[in-house]
Regions:
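Alpha4 helix (beta4-alpha4-beta5 surface) of REC/receiver domains from two-component response regulators
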Residues: 57, 78-98, 105, 109
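Conserved phosphotransfer cores of two-component systems
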Residues: 37-39, 61-69, 92
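Active-site residues of response regulator receiver
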Residues: 47
Length: 121
């Protein structure tokens, strides 16, 4: 998970770990890409607006790597152009997009749909 909002990262981590998922987290796109290259993840949850490297740059970089993780892009906070950047994220290869704020159950539903058999055990 890559998001510069530590409170949100914590809430998402708690929900995902409670559902049985292992969670890696980074506060910016640069650190997140490094973590993905070192640890790898089946699914990457990425915020669009982050310091260092934004979510669109991260998605471009992840699409160039092997193996390609499943990507869920998120954005919110009432930012101008939020829908447009999520559409851009989808065009770049994000499998799904989420508008913040969202309920943990919404995120879990998306993850289960995307990972299918690779879901948490």
């Amino acid at each position: 998970m890559m998001d510069d909002d530590g409170t949100l990262r914590g809430a998402i981590r708690v929900a995902l770990e409670a559902a049985g998922y292992e969670v890696l987290e980074a506060a910016d796109g640069h650190a997140g890409l490094r973590l993905q290259r070192e640890q790898g993840a089946d699914l990457v949850l990425v915020d669009i607006f982050m310091p260092e490297r934004d979510g669109l740059e991260v998605i471009r970089a992840l699409r160039a790597e092997q193996p390609k993780p499943t990507i869920v892009a998120m954005s919110g906070g009432g930012r101008t152009g939020q829908i447009e950047v999520l559409e851009a994220a989808a065009a770049l290869g994000a499998s799904r997009t989420l508008v913040k704020p969202f309920e943990p159950r919404q995120l879990l539903k998306v993850i289960r749909e995307l990972l299918g058999e690779r879901a948490a055990s």
